[in-house]
Amino acid sequence: MSHSVKIYDTCIGCTQCVRACPTDVLEMIPWDGCKAKQIAPAPRTEDCVGCKRCESACPTDFLSVRVYLWYETTRSMGLAY
């Protein structure tokens, strides 16, 4: 199952998302495109389980996890109701 993590420029480098990820998908790397000069990309998206704990932990709404598999998206949407 593969998920994409959308990157915004509001990262403050607090590492809350990295610590919240149960599968250690995220890691901090240098990046000039945000205030903190470092960013938490998802180099191992195949390990992402789509729990969105990183989104919940982020104080600046930096991360957005999107599911790109049709089956997985429909299943996730069904869980919301």
UniProtKB/Swiss-Prot annotation:
It catalyses: reduced [plastocyanin] + hnu + oxidized [2Fe-2S]-[ferredoxin] = oxidized [plastocyanin] + reduced [2Fe-2S]-[ferredoxin]. It comes from Illicium oligandrum. InterPro entries: 4Fe4S_Fe-S-bd, 4Fe4S_Fe_S_CS, PSI_iron-sulfur_center, PSI_PsaC. It is a peripheral membrane protein. Apoprotein for the two 4Fe-4S centers FA and FB of photosystem I (PSI); essential for photochemical activity. FB is the terminal electron acceptor of PSI, donating electrons to ferredoxin. The C-terminus interacts with PsaA/B/D and helps assemble the protein into the PSI complex. Required for binding of PsaD and PsaE to PSI. PSI is a plastocyanin-ferredoxin oxidoreductase, converting photonic excitation into a charge separation, which transfers an electron from the donor P700 chlorophyll pair to the spectroscopically characterized acceptors A0, A1, FX, FA and FB in turn. One of its GO terms (cellular component) is chloroplast thylakoid membrane. Its cofactor is [4Fe-4S] cluster. This is Photosystem I iron-sulfur center. The gene is psaC. It is found in: Plastid, Chloroplast thylakoid membrane.
